[in-house]
């Protein structure tokens, strides 16, 4: 099984288009300590030929261009991407579907809740049903989005997408709104959880023994955005568990047997973006890798 992290940043990427926080300023200036990152997306294949796209980032065209394995390879119209899987309905995970509208057949897999959120916005009707079949996926049931891959979706604590919020949303519920994906091939297991509000005992059980974990690394501390002066929301309010602190991902998963631990979906205000920073060194000392675009894994 091969996996390519197409986009390793949270919504807006790094640098964000209008941001001059310290990390974005470094990225705008070409400072090598802060690599530019596109928005969250993953590609997985059992054979290097047929690929599953997990989440369709607004940056998907740029990501495909940067990834030769995903280039058209034959005929006038072709794509190695045979299926797309959504883990929630966030803008940074669904907006890229609009780029995939050029009469190219693929299957779109998601829970009923997530499919309904896509169907609720008619702009996604540009994905013509004769080309893009929408397939409902039940939680906790294995399915094969492409031959050779077995995928099981499971609920993780989350919240509704920002664009569907009405009033004060409930945060931390485990429903079909936010899911993780356990992807298996050749006896190896990869877990992809780009959004998670808190680590529960059930989540620890599900992740136990996986060969690779790609996990929500949106914020270092719960109040990253407030400290940076660019926002008022905490990680919890956005539905994201912090990396550090009491109840943070590092501490909560420390005793869980996991092969390789990688943070993805990293917000522009997260100090781990700066290579050789105190925050980066602290995370790496705990056995975690900070993802970058193009990071390729062979399992």
UniProtKB/Swiss-Prot annotation:
Xref: Gene3D superfamilies: Ribonuclease Z/Hydroxyacylglutathione hydrolase-like (3.60.15.10)
GO biological process: pyrroloquinoline quinone biosynthetic process
Transmembrane spans: none
UniProt pathway: Cofactor biosynthesis; pyrroloquinoline quinone biosynthesis
Swiss-Prot/TrEMBL keywords: PQQ biosynthesis, Transport
Protein's UniProt keywords contain Transport: yes
InterPro entries reported in the protein's UniProt record: Metallo-B-lactamas, PQQ_synth_PqqB, RibonucZ/Hydroxyglut_hydro
Entries under SUPFAM superfamilies matching the protein: Metallo-hydrolase/oxidoreductase
Protein origin, superkingdom: Bacteria
Name of protein: Coenzyme PQQ synthesis protein B
Organism encoding this protein: Methylobacterium sp. (strain 4-46)
Gene this protein is translated from: pqqB
């Amino acid at each position: 099984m091969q996996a390519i992290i197409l986009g390793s940043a949270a919504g807006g990427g790094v640098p964000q288009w209008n941001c001059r926080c310290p990390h974005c300023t470094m990225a705008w200036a070409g400072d090598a300590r802060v690599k530019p990152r596109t928005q969250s997306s993953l590609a997985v294949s059992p054979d290097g030929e047929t690929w599953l796209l997990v989440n369709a980032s607004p940056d998907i065209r740029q990501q495909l261009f940067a990834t030769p394995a995903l280039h058209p390879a034959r005929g006038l119209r072709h794509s190695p991407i045979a299926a797309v899987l959504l883990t929630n309905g966030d803008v940074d995970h669904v907006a890229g579907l609009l780029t995939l509208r050029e009469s190219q057949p693929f299957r779109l897999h998601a829970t009923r809740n997530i499919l309904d959120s896509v169907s609720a916005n008619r702009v996604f009707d540009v994905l013509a049903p004769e080309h893009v079949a929408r397939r409902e996926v039940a939680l906790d049931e294995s399915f094969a989005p492409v031959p050779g891959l077995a995928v099981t979706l499971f609920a993780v604590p989350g919240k509704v997408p920002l664009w569907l919020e009405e009033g004060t949303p409930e945060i931390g519920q485990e429903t079909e709104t936010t899911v993780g994906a356990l992807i298996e091939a050749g006896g190896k297991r990869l877990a992809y959880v780009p959004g998670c509000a808190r680590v529960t005992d059930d989540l620890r059980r599900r992740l136990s023994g996986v060969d690779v974990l790609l996990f929500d690394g949106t914020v270092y501390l719960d109040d990253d955005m407030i400290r940076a002066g660019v926002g008022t929301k905490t990680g919890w309010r956005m539905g994201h568990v912090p990396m550090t602190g009491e109840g943070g991902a590092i501490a909560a998963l420390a005793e869980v047997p996991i092969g390789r631990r990688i943070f993805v979906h990293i917000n522009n205000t997260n100090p781990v973006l700066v290579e050789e920073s105190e925050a980066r060194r602290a995370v790496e000392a705990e056995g975690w890798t900070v993802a970058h675009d193009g990071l390729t894994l062979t399992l």
